[in-house]
Amino acid sequence: MMKKLSILCLTVLLTAITANAQMRKVTNMDAGWRFHLGNVENSEKTSFNDAGWRLLNVPHDWSIEGENLRDNPGGGSIGFFPTGLGWYRKMFDVKSFDSRKRYSIEFDGIYMNSTVWLNGHELGTWPYGYSSFSYDLTPYLKQKGNVLAVRVDNSQQTNSRWYSGSGIYRHVRLVETAATHFAKWGVFNSTLTLNDNEAVVRVKSDVENEEVGNRRLTLRHEVVDAMGVCVAKTEKVVSLKASETTADEQTLAVTHPHVWNLEHPYLYTLRSTLLDGKRIVDVVENTLGIRTIEYPLDKGFLLNGKQVKMKGVNLHHDGGAVGAAVPERVWERRLEILKSGGCNAIRTAHNPPAPEFLDLCDRMGFLVMDEAFDQWINGKNKQDYHLYYREWHERDLSAMVKRDRNHPSVVMWSIGNEIRDQRSEEGPGAAAEMIAICHRLDDTRLVTSGNDEIASNSPTSPEFLAAFENDIIGYNYPDRWRTRREVLYAIDKTNYPNRRVVATESTGLGGPRRQYQWPGTMPPPQLGAGADGFSPQQQLPPRFRRRNRGLISSEMIDVEHRWRFTTAYDYVIGDFMWTGIDYYGESGWPSRGSQSGYLDNCGFKKDSYWFFKSIWSDEPVLHLLPHWNWEGHEGQIMQVACFTNCTDVELFVNGKSYGKKSTEFPRRGVNPSWASYDPGKHFATTADLHLTWDVEYQPGEIKVVAVRDSVTVEEVIRTAGAPAQMRATVDRPSFRAVPSDVAHVTIEVLDKDGNLCPLADNLVRFNVKGGRLLGVENGNMTDLGSVLASERKAWSGKCMAIVAADKPGPVTVTAEADGIQTASITFTATIDKPQRTPKKTK
């Protein structure tokens, strides 16, 4: 039967394509734009001469190209990057132009206050910089000599609390359809029922008939598997009234379905077709992940009927050295590293992400809290979204929900973050209205927001929280509310047993990567809140300094306790820590950004990455810190720490044992009934989720040896000598010569024996042959050198270059530094699917 269905689907498709005359056509419009930074009168006019403007491709972010200056209007909120006003112009022809068709231009995101013209005619303005939107070009389009002009105004500062970027920083498309066509984002799929034998998929669709007369067309939906085989099909004849949008609903049964889950995120394609007889009128394809989501009051979150704890991180949208115009591979690599650390959930703080980000989450198996706004009626900055909320929030929220509702990775909507209207008279009504919008457009997901004042001295109003009582209450920093540090959500769950609970934002363990201060009894910054001993940060205002308060710091205690609580109580949906990755903005001079992530903005792992992996992952974890280069402190006592999920960890310093230690998890008494677990056979020396030893510092070697599932594992750190050489590695041996793909080349400064030099800050100069250098970074937010330069200092012994290619062939990256051996690596740019195995220099 399946073979017959597949042949039938293929036969019908081929027949229809043969008879087709009006199929949808989507053209990428990223290439060949002219750009000018600054305002020029009459730039929207067709006759304007833009020959002197810069030629570039979008996505493009002009802020990342500028200099970080203390007096830049956006200030520390956006990392002291420049903003301003810019113009883009593009000339294009439409060879297949047909006056009977409909044409639109789609922008995935322009930051911000963009106005668009076609051939001198103003199409409209869109203030919000994170929305995807489109304009109808049909009335003004011609076959040849079209001019598209876009004015982008990011000059009104401050309008963001984090780095926004400036410009057409996401993709652009030209869409050509027949006059009768599927509405934009007009097909919505969801899984109604699911078992091993069958999944029932519901498809809702909106069809626009812009003809002058009524029409009767066949509306067909097909489910196509990953091999291209049609596995389910349904169709019916629909009557379409002239100049109206018609809604339709159908269901399909998929037998023996492959489910979408975190381990095997299987994706089907839903192909939706409008036919006039055998002639295709329109076709759209959408991702289909067959999965069910539930939020039972006592079990938190169920994916396909199985309980899953959300091990989440908050992420801002910049991509480090590439700014806001992020090639897809940059996010793919970052998500690969997060996934390897046990992370399974992302909160898109605090705006809708790029569409391709969600495509990656679909393919890689992440759960996403898709967030809309950082402000509503009352603002946080003079020029932020509160100026536009009343007029624009319904359009912006609807755009997010309709655009993203076919992504199986998206499992809940968030309508706000730390909204000032938590206590205002208008807040409850605004929340209720937006929740209703979400439910009207998507009846499969619940809604939350990040509330940071639930138990504060000026608490969130009961009426505001009541708006979410049938959905999910999001808690920002629940561990900071004094008496609630221990009980967290328990008081509210007792008082409101029907409340669903998620930690939308909570304390993380950030700090500068591998930067420590002496004395050794003070911990590495990632264990506490950072280190005043990191000398550049001593220049920061007190608000932005990262203070080091001891290994058993409040941050470490909070994180460990919060995770125990989260795992012990089934009703807690999960925890989203702040943040997964360092980001530009929200900083004080001379810092460009926040170092709150457990990855820096190169994607390099901090110590805290290994802490979270030790509690989130089932893979053996054994991580030792700090580094072992403490010249001048020989014979003094310092602290050594270990993050692990192994048992019986033993520390050796230059061969001398400092004894075995073990963690105990969960701690006795954190379960709903006291000690309702088997504590295991080993003797726990601590109830914390990390281990420490006080040792005498002597140069040489520190080593930890541990046992995991009867397998012995170890980690060694050695005292490094003077920098003598460099090692170059690339994330993959090959990558595609397309704009969405890049290669990440990591440079490590080593001593003569190959040990990483943890204090090295050599200036590294890059030369690229066969490709283009897109950007350089090192993770040091106080390094104010341009990320578009061809050189970068190493920081904690490492730096990175991001490389692109315009054509297939070998790409060679050479790194040079004064006084040490040069490193070089060659890899391949190809038009084929890239290899996944990392490549290193010998």
Locations of the language-model features?
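Non-catalytic, glycine-rich low-complexity segments
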Residues: 23-40, 52-95, 108, 112, ...
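Beta-strand-rich structural segments
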Residues: 203-207, 638-644, 705, 740-758, ...
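Short flexible loop/turn segments that cap and initiate beta-strands
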Residues: 46-48, 214-220, 261-269, 645, ...
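Active-site-adjacent substrate/metal-binding segments within catalytic domains
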Residues: 60-107, 111-119, 124-127, 175, ...
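Accessory beta-strand-rich segments of carbohydrate-active enzymes
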Residues: 29, 37-39, 78, 83-185, ...
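Substrate-binding/catalytic cleft of secreted carbohydrate-active enzymes
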Residues: 278, 335-338, 344-608, 612, ...
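Catalytic cores of secreted or luminal carbohydrate-active enzymes
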Residues: 161-183, 574-635, 639-725, 755-757
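Extended acidic/polar, glycine-enriched regions
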Residues: 142-143, 206-296, 693-699, 708-709, ...
